[in-house]
């Protein structure tokens, strides 16, 4: 069989065999096999050319995908599958990309940890879930997370949360809110507890008084339409207690309010 045409088509070349069969190849394929018009090739050579062409095309696709940002092995694999690259060829491409240091899931995890250390606010649990979603093996993630100290990140995050909620919640509710927010961000209960102990959460009687009367106004409008006297007082007491106010503060506020 003979190559009867080689025609450039944007980033690929269209090759024609015996004026009948057509398929696309990369420039690397032309160079590798020294292909040219009228060159005679054997059937087994044709299959080798096709396989190499898909490998070359797939690797170029992967490198293009990696040029935008760091990716995991699973992300690159899925990208190549979406572009109809043969699964056997994909395995070969991934192997070569790892050998050439274009792909490294361990380095990917380390970069995520360093970014989180310097500018993030997530604990180990949330980071693990995000890394799992990227297709990284659970054992590799756990091996790299187990020796990483999240305490400084937890304390820094707790300080930011304190500034956000301190003027909005009474002390008891504030501690519960901070602990809940920290565990939601992926920190362990122990890390959250240590971070809260490190914070300087002071009693602010003026702020708490302002908060309790503000909440009392709100709850009174809600319950006074349905209840009165003892039942109303009970409803207000229960509602304010759920908001984290101390019973002594609630009793004093109700004495003046009602």
Curated annotation (Swiss-Prot):
Task: Give its localization.
Answer: Cytoplasm
Q: What does this protein do?
A: Modulates RecA activity.
Indicate whether Transcription appears among the record's keywords. no
Which residue pairs form cystines in this protein?
none
HAMAP family from the UniProt entry: RecX
Record GO cellular component, one term: cytoplasm
Homology family = Belongs to the RecX family.
Q: Identify the Pfam families for this entry.
A: RecX_HTH1 (PF21982), RecX_HTH3 (PF21981)
> Which UniProt keywords are listed?
Cytoplasm
NAD is among the record's keywords: no
Ranked from the top, the taxonomy reads: Bacteria, Bacillati, Bacillota, Bacilli, Lactobacillales
* Main localisation: cytoplasm
- Origin species, per record, is Streptococcus mutans serotype c (strain ATCC 700610 / UA159)
GO BP = regulation of DNA repair
* Name of the coding gene: recX
This chain belongs to which protein, by name? Regulatory protein RecX
